[in-house]
Amino acid sequence: NLAETLPRPIVYGDEDGEALLVSWGSSWGPVQEAVDQGRSRGQKISGLPIRYLSPLPPGLKEIFARFKRIFVVELNDSGLYGYGGQLATVLRAVLCDDRIQGITKTDGLNFKVREILGQADYLLGRSPVHARGAGIR
């Protein structure tokens, strides 16, 4: 089985916590910075880069189980079913985990750290308003 030969993804930050920011591609840099800034403010937030999509890397279910909330940060539309972008929808379907939510944006520009943290704060109930320029599903 090819999936079993892939390396397990490595969590950036604490191995468990309140929120896990999952990312792939060009969103990973801003996610790393968001994790660093969030942790410097005392938040239990970590990041996880996804490097393989088909098949998905092994161990995702076990990693996700250690976090209260999973946010998939991607430059993508929120999708037909409103779960977030395409990766969030795939992860929800494959892992059968309704804690997975998307933090999406479709204006063609990279995420700003404040957008990621603003949306994460909103989804975690810390802020009554989410960051402008990015969608939440």
What are these regions (language model features)?
Residues 50-58, 109:
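Short acidic loop-to-helix transition motifs that present clustered carboxylates
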Residues 1-19, 32:
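Glycine-/acidic-rich phosphate or pyrophosphate-binding loops and their flanking alpha/beta elements
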Residues 33-36, 55-65:
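Short glycine/threonine-rich loop-to-helix capping motif typified by GTGT followed
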